[in-house]
């Protein structure tokens, strides 16, 4: 298991999403809301474009930490607030940046703070994992 010091970077990664990524996630999750794959439907409800599923964004963020830790069982808590959508362009897709840093450490666990951004916009607020140590 890793040792944790407040302020240390646990992991950092950019993840590229495409419209195909959204369709694949829809199939796996069963969430076929057309705002996740049809521009016309997204526009008709006032959205700026097709949106990535919030749970996909949340899963991507946690996967960055899981890859660094190598142990999914170490994660004992995970929570986020969805603050802004990730709009996935039909041609260029969308790049989501995840930065995971140690926010706090106690005798039994470490809190990992996630900064998840799309462009200059934070898309997940209060994104934190608790990891057993």
Region annotations inferred by a language model:
Residues 1-52:
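Catalytic strand-loop segment that frames the active site of acyl-thioester-processing enzymes
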Residues 1-10, 90-133:
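HotDog/MaoC-like acyl-thioester-processing domains
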Residues 12, 75-77, 126:
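Hydrophobic residues on conserved beta-strands that form the core of alpha/beta folds
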Residues 14-16, 81, 128-132:
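Generic structural detector for well-ordered beta-strands
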Residues 48, 57-99:
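Hydrophobic beta-strand-centered segment that forms part of the acyl-chain substrate-binding groove
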Residues 51-57, 118-122:
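Noncatalytic linker/hinge segments flanking ATPase motor cores
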Residues 52, 74, 108-110:
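Short loop/turn segments at connectors of secondary-structure elements within structured domains
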